[in-house]
Amino acid sequence: ALTLKVSYGAQGNDNLGTYYASSGLYSVVSNNGENALVSDRLATPKLKWETNLNFNAGIDFSLFNNRFSGSFDFFQRRSKDLLYSRPLAPSLGYNSVDENVGELKNTGVEIDLKGTLIHTRDFMWRLGLNLTHYKNVVTDLPLKDMPVSGVHKLAVGRSVYDFYMKQWAGVDPENGDPLWYKNVKDANDKITGRTTTNDYAQADYYYTGKSSLPKVYGGFNTAFSYKGFELSTIFAYSIGNYIVDRDVTMLWHNGSSTGRAWSTEILNRWTPENRYTDVPALKTVSNSWNANSTRNLFNNSFLRMKNITLSYNFPQPMIKKISLNSLQLFVQADNLLTVSKNQGLDPEQDISGLTYYRPCVPSPEESMFRSKALIPGKGLLQSYAPPRFNHA
């Protein structure tokens, strides 16, 4: 069987937070016994909804009496009048102003496949896979040179998830200072090359060629059944995405912050005897070496076993003797295995690509034992032993 599907529609987005209704209004405050009126945000009476124009096309199929099935979907979303909080100069008295700033296009594919690979009288093997790949491109902006926003900068032809950061250049072997790259310019202010600086404020921003958007992400599952037993697993994965890990940088201070924990990397710090290293020398004053740069930009690809379950369904002749329609015992565990290049604690993060003060424990490993019984006239009865947690 084959089914074709096509859809098109418009969708609005007004995700500006709850403060929008009070923008432009004043609050009465008191400071040192003096009353005053304070405005938190600039009024934006011409601000409009962000509009998303969505197009989807695909096919659903099934083969061999539904033994194999799946779907292929193509989608494109064109967004215009993008909602954006544009940073303002501190001299204006406001941090930012909400604006409709440009247009954006998302294009991608989604694939979902599942099938029964082996099916005999006593044994069955099922397998499922899904993946998503999409690209994100800014197509129009009101300004040629948009301001830097965190670790990103909007630019036509680039993704909103591209990292725009200062680039780490290593450690000066002569004195242990941290180094970053900065541009070299001629008399006409034209960039002619790059050099290094130990002053973080003098370093320039660059597009890194890395993105917080995965090249592909999704999951897969498999299940093996033999007579009444079944073993099933569920995996999630993400490939090609990067993350700026601000959690690990809290352990990368240079010694000027007393009483704080250190990463074990500090054992490889610069000393006169260890000149060629990537960890700067200890200092009594801050040198910004743990500030945002490509040094704390990590590959966040991962593979995680989300769940594994072993179950047993008792034979019908046996359970009918005790007035049950069905009886199943099973043991399951979550998050038993995670493979990741990221030094952080949990690779499953949001699409922003920036973490800070994440929970200080990874996703917990959880295991439990349960039983389910279907009782005629009374419905489903479940019982289980309390779960056990193990924080790896």
Task: Identify the residue ranges that each predicted region occupies.
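Outer-membrane beta-barrel signature, preferentially recognizing the C-terminal barrel domain
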Residues: 29-69, 97-120, 157-162, 211-217, ...
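C-terminal beta-signal and terminal closure region of outer-membrane beta-barrel proteins
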Residues: 101-106, 149-177, 266-267, 272-274, ...
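Conserved small-residue
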Residues: 99, 116-212, 252, 334
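Solvent-exposed loop/turn elements at secondary-structure boundaries
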Residues: 2-50, 69, 73-104, 147-148, ...
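Extracytoplasmic gating/loop element in the C-terminal half of outer-membrane beta-barrel translocons
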Residues: 238-328, 333
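Transmembrane beta-strands of outer-membrane beta-barrel pores
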Residues: 8-12, 74-80, 115-117, 131-137, ...
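Residues on the lipid-exposed face of transmembrane beta-strands in outer-membrane beta-barrel proteins
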Residues: 57-61, 72, 111-115, 220-226, ...
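Short loop/turn motifs that connect adjacent beta-strands in outer-membrane beta-barrel proteins
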Residues: 1-2, 64-67, 118-125, 138-143, ...
